[in-house]
Swiss-Prot record:
The gene is NOS3. The keyword Iron applies. Its cofactor is heme b; FAD; FMN; (6R)-L-erythro-5,6,7,8-tetrahydrobiopterin. The modification Phosphothreonine is found at residues 33, 495, 1175. It comes from Homo sapiens. This is Nitric oxide synthase 3.
Length: 1203
């Protein structure tokens, strides 16, 4: 299929190639005894031995047990044992006394229809073997799913006499059939076979539509792609789906009165059948044949291939100008269509598959064979060669020039083709791969060796073992021959009008059927729900031309990736470059998969997924290595595990963080590593600026790229405009509220909304840690967990808290709702769903996003009413504004990214403030309940140790309050911090624990540690010192004292936990405690990075580079970046190295989990930094939307994966 001589009916292996290298081919010899040494065969059957044979490699005997065929490479002397041959499913055509290996169509290997249904025992045996193969391939052998699937198949066979393959099983089976094809030289690409499932086909008309789409996809404007379309399986008591043509594209052969043939003599019979069925021939040498297609129990029907589908290449020679005048041509796509596909005992008589040509198939076989076009002598005469004697080697010279012309012409036309030297070299690599992976590879030497240059290719010198595995492709009798099956008789000729109408109907169906069967999987990983919302929008867009499904990453089985066609990923990045919580299992499984370009003998390069995700950069030598290999790869290289996957990724994040979109970058990188094909460069949306606009531009580009790749969809841009238009997004008449009998229970409601386990803690105390003279507040919140197992934690972990909105804000918003339900009435939103043919009828369906609750409860506990509305929501509000001016202003804000971002940045308005700015906007209750984002949990570092405070969780929280509009706007409050500060003992707090395994003290207490945390960045370190204090006092340990670097404004106002730290230092927890004061009277401003540089430079270098110690940094993004840069400079200075080298050292420290960061979001003092980042993002986004830069471009200096 990469090269089709293997299985296509272009009969006749090269003459005289039985040779000694075919030993072990006969199935009757079996694997029980080793193949005899070639030296014992008659000398006339042996290739000449090399003059200087290299010594044989040491023999590695297979495990004790049955003897396996011994296979030698006579060129290099290596010897292997083919253990896979013991799994052969079928005897070959040979007998103990006769070798029939050179027969083209051995009768024993033909798939003939059985007179009756297959015996259930035989079918079950084959089915079990295949199901076992499938589950072994996905590493689920013996699992509950495996056993359950076997039981399902057994029950189905018992009830119906047959069974149906799942789609993933069909994909696996079709790829394995190609992998097992012993006559195919191009199998190294078996993993890249694109499988189209056409088992729902019901008529010859539908068959033709599927086939047209197959040709269009596989041809791909000359950049050929291997593909197979599988039609319904053979069923007892019913005729077969059959394609009468041996290939989808063939040239006609017209028998002349003198017995000669004009055109291709191999196709005379099918040409005459087409004429009998109404085709009007053209009588040319290269007329493309129509297709004869047959549905079960119906006569065959004739279909003309639309000319625009068939790509042909006129043949010319690079130096022989007269060659073009010969008028030769050949088609681009070799697509075998008359072979039977067998998978697990099921037979698919119609399963056309295609790849690309090896040049000798055209130049030597099709054009030069005497029983084909037979142009050899004509070319030799034109070359002035002496054709009177064979000793002039005129045949060889002419054949070479014809092959040169074929290669030159295909390359000139930019049509995929491979020469026989490259193809056979790739087959040797495939043999090596298969020997490692499966212990052998079935191969028919007589078909693998090309028809010219035999001993000049490496396969000539390679012994091979031929045997037959399942799944497999098998030959089958022509449908019009032998005992005629029902419906194969010749019917009346069709008129030209009837044929033309059939073509017209088929052309109109093209694309529709393709869209129905090209499935797309859209995966999202989300912390706040925004990635999920984007994924759902992407699903609506792709529904225009594909069959998409939208799944959360934690709902997806990663092994399915190997059988996917198209995957789109939309994901956020959490905290310090980590996956969102619902993406962690996906990330771990993705890292465990193996790929073709990332194997490494060095174990240190197999990093944990979080560490590697945070370390991936273009400067990583491992990444650079496989990217170089990927760029240099071709159709003669092996495909990765995801060889048939096309993918694209969009990441959400903030450029204020040092690991901007790190998880999305890593998924994008990893999918390519595993062999997937990227349709579009990574898209990135910055929450500081234009995130929604960036997503919409990327989504449109991704949709257009996918449509072009799979040859579906007509107007991608129009579809995207339709999907993202405000008129389509929300319609008042499609939503209503329905009264519900049951009221809200808060904890189950939060579990429903956030799709995670929640627990209820209670307040023990809330204490202000700052001086009463301070204008700010930092509180210590003590929670009582009641000993709940779900709230167990380790120091360094995070706690997620679900706060409510302020009651005053909720009441003010309720007063603006135009049609509020009764204040105490629980309601649910219902949406009017359109009916679909064969699906449920139109009707009202409940929106599952929120549990039944009152409108006040929804606005209080579940919906975000304080964040600035998105452009999408502003577009909806513009359609509800009564004043034209307000409508225009809202529309302008929603459409102009820069204007929106400036408005949002200056005002940071809540929803209520937007309504005050645009008072004519009507506010339906269903709009609030369906379009407002969810109120997200707030995360805090745990500030305690369970050993010191069992049953408690402590939080250190800065209470946030600020004014917008340069300090002149309304006062805004932190949702969670303000709520926590107002709680009383006994008040409930819904919460949960999120582990942070990469931010924990080392298990070895003797390793030195440096802790850096200004302000509330000291929070996790309080748990650290409490744990160490417990180890000292309760376990008698003597850990190496740690160093703490703390920062605050003023020693008299906000020096948090000063007394606790002094006590811990006195007890041996800390060796040094250093504090930086940024607002201390009569002292210069000092920050934690200044302390590191001036007082701890030598210690930082010693701890990190000489003593294998650890450094922990906790704080906001600006501080963390400054500390990182300072540490880099310290290592460069103290270690006498270049700055770039120091950056690499920090990368290694991260990989070794010795440089730890716990970074939280933007604070008020980061405005200068974020303003600069927003300016960069604006420039980048505008250039992306103009197409001036790729979606993955980063402005200079913004490589957030490098220190």
């Amino acid at each position: 299929m990469g090269n089709l001589k293997s299985v296509a009916q272009e009969p006749g292996p090269p003459c005289g190639l039985g040779l000694g290298l075919g030993l072990g081919l006969c199935g009757k010899q079996g694997p029980a005894t080793p193949a005899p040494e070639p030296s014992r065969a008659p000398a006339s059957l042996l290739p000449p031995a090399p003059e200087h044979s290299p010594p044989s490699s040491p023999l590695t005997q297979p495990p004790e047990g049955p003897k396996f065929p011994r296979v030698k490479n006579w060129e290099v002397g290596s010897i292997t044992y083919d253990t896979l041959s013991a799994q052969a499913q079928q005897d070959g055509p040979c007998t103990p006394r006769r070798c029939l290996g050179s027969l083209v169509f051995p009768r024993k290997l033909q798939g003939r229809p059985s007179p009756g249904p297959p015996a259930p025992e035989q079918l079950l045996s084959q089915a079990r073997d295949f199901i076992n193969q499938y589950y072994s391939s996905i590493k689920r052998s013996g699992s509950q799913a495996h056993e359950q699937r076997l039981q399902e198949v057994e029950a189905e066979v018992a009830a119906t006499g047959t069974y149906q393959l799942r789609e993933s099983e069909l994909v696996f089976g079709a790829k394995q059939a190609w992998r097992n094809a012993p006559r195919c030289v191009g199998r190294i690409q078996w993993g890249k076979l694109q499988v189209f499932d056409a088992r729902d086909c019901r008529s010859a008309q539908e068959m033709f539509t599927y086939i047209c789409n197959h040709i269009k996809y596989a041809t791909n404007r000359g950049n050929l792609r291997s593909a197979i379309t599988v039609f319904p399986q053979r069923c007892p008591g019913r005729g077969d789906f059959r394609i009468w043509n041996s290939q989808l594209v063939r040239y006609a052969g017209y028998r002349q009165q003198d017995g000669s043939v004009r055109g291709d003599p191999a196709n005379v019979e099918i040409t005459e059948l087409c004429i009998q069925h109404g085709w009007t021939p053209g009588n040319g040498r290269f007329d493309v044949l129509p297709l004869l297609l047959q549905a079960p129990d119906d006569p065959p029907e004739l279909f003309l291939l639309p000319p625009e589908l068939v790509l042909e290449v006129p043949l010319e020679h690079p130096t022989l100008e007269w060659f073009a005048a010969l008028g030769l041509r050949w088609y681009a796509l070799p697509a075998v269509s008359n072979m039977l596909l067998e998978i697990g005992g099921l037979e698919f008589p119609a399963a056309p598959f295609s790849g690309w040509y090896m040049s000798t198939e055209i130049g030597t076989r099709n054009l030069c064979d005497p029983h084909r076009y037979n142009i050899l002598e004509d070319v030799a005469v034109c070359m002035d060669l002496d054709t009177r004697t064979t000793s002039s080697l005129w045949k060889d010279k002419a054949a070479v020039e014809i092959n040169v012309a074929v290669l030159h012409s295909y390359q000139l036309a930019k049509v995929t083709i491979v020469d026989h030297h490259a193809a056979t070299a790739s087959f040797m690599k495939h043999l090596e791969n298969e020997q490692k992976a499966r212990g052998g590879c079935p191969a028919d030497w007589a078909w693998i060796v090309p028809p010219i240059s035999g001993s000049l290719t490496p396969v000539f010198h390679q012994e091979m073992v031929n045997y037959f595995l399942s799944p497999a492709f098998r030959y089958q009798p022509d449908p019009w021959k032998g005992s005629a099956a029902k419906g194969t008789g010749i019917t009346r000729k069709k008129t030209f009008k009837e044929v033309a109408n059939a073509v017209k109907i088929s052309a109109s169906l093209m694309g529709t059927v393709m869209a129905k069967r090209v499935k797309a999987t859209i995966l999202y990983g989300s912390e706040t729900g925004r990635a999920q919302s984007y994924a759902q929008q992407l699903g609506r867009l792709f529904r225009k031309a594909f069959d998409p499904r939208v799944l959360c990453m934690d709902e997806y089985d990663v092994v399915s990736l190997e059988h996917e066609t198209l995957v789109l990923v939309v994901t956020s990045t959490f905290g310090n470059g980590d996956p969102p919580e619902n993406g962690e299992s996906f990330a771990a499984a993705l890292m465990e998969m193996s790929g073709p370009y990332n194997s490494s003998p060095r174990p240190e390069q197999h990093k944990s997924y979080k560490i590697r995700f945070n370390s991936i950069s273009c400067s990583d030598p491992l990444v650079s290595s496989w990217r170089r290999k990927r760029k240099e790869s071709s159709n003669t290289d092996s495909a990765g595990a995801l060889g048939t996957l096309r993918f694209c990724v969009f990441g959400l994040g903030s450029r204020a963080y040092p690991h901007f979109c790190a998880f999305a970058r890593a998924v994008d990188t990893r999918l390519e590593e595993l062999g997937g094909e990227r349709l579009l460069q990574l898209g990135q949306g910055d929450e500081l600026c234009g995130q929604e606009e960036a997503f919409r531009g990327w989504a449109q580009a991704a949709f257009q790229a996918a449509c072009e790749t799979f040859c579906v969809g007509e107007d991608a841009k129009a579809a995207a405009r339709d999907i993202f238009s405000p008129k389509r997004s929300w319609k008042r008449q499609r939503y209503r509220l329905s009264a519900q009998a049951e009221g809200l229970q808060l904890l189950p409601g939060l579990i429903h909304v956030h799709r995670r386990k929640m627990f209820q803690a209670t307040i023990r105390s809330v204490e202000n840690l700052q001086s009463s003279k301070s204008t700010r507040a930092t509180i210590l919140v003590r929670l009582d967990t009641g000993g709940q197992e779900g709230l167990q934690y380790q120091p360094g972990d995070h706690i997620g808290v679900c706060p409510p909105n302020r009651p005053g804000l909720v009441e003010a918003l309720l007063s603006r709702v135009e049609d509020p339900p009764a204040p105490t009435e629980p309601v649910a939103v219902e949406q009017l769903e359109k009916g679909s043919p064969g699906g449920p009828p139109p009707g009202w369906v409940r929106d599952p996003r929120l549990p039944p609750c009152t409108l006040r409860q929804a606005l209080t506990f579940f919906l975000d009413i304080t964040s600035p509305p998105s452009p999408q929501l502003l577009r909806l509000l513009s359609t509800l504004a009564e004043e034209p001016r307000e409508q225009q202003e809202l529309e302008a804000l929603s459409q102009d990214p820069r204007r929106y971002e400036e408005w949002k940045w200056f005002r940071c308005p809540t929803l209520l403030e937007v309504l005050e700015q645009f008072p004519s906007v009507a506010l339906p209750a269903p709009l609030l309940l369906t379009q407002l984002p969810l109120l997200q949990p707030r995360y805090y570092s745990v500030s305690s140790a369970p050993s010191t405070h069992p049953g408690e969780i402590h939080l250190t929280v800065a209470v946030l309050a600020y004014r917008t509009q340069d300090g002149l706007g309304p006062l805004h409050y932190g949702v969670c911090s303000t709520w926590l500060s107002q709680l009383k003992p006994g008040d409930p707090v819904p919460c949960f624990i999120r582990g942070a395994p990469s931010f924990r003290l080392p298990p070895d207490p003797s390793l030195p540690c440096i802790l850096v945390g200004p302000g509330t960045g000291i929070a996790p370190f309080r748990g650290f010192w409490q744990e160490r204090l417990h180890d000292i006092e309760s376990k008698g340990l003597q850990p190496t004292p740690m160093t703490l670097v703390f920062g605050c404004r003023c020693s008299q106002l906000d020096h948090l936990y000063r007394d606790e730290v002094q006590n811990a230092q006195q007890r041996g927890v800390f060796g040094r405690v250093l504090t930086a004061f940024s607002r201390e009277p009569d002292n210069p401003k000092t920050y934690v990075q200044d302390i590191l540089r001036t007082e701890l430079a030598a210690e930082v270098h010693r701890v990190l580079c000489l003593e294998r110690g650890h450094m922990f940094v906790c704080g906001d993004v600006t501080m963390a970046t400054n500390v990182l840069q300072t540490v880099q400079r310290i290592l460069a200075t103290e270690g006498d190295m270049e700055l770039d080298e120091a950056g690499d050292v920090i990368g290694v420290l991260r990989d070794q989990q010795r440089y730890h960061e716990d970074i939280f979001g933007l604070t008020l003092r980061t405005q200068e930094v974020t303003s600069r980042i927003r300016t960069q993002s604006f420039s980048l986004q505008e250039r992306q939307l103009r197409g001036a830069v790729p979606w993955a471009f980063d402005p200079p200096g913004s490589d957030t994966n490098s220190p």
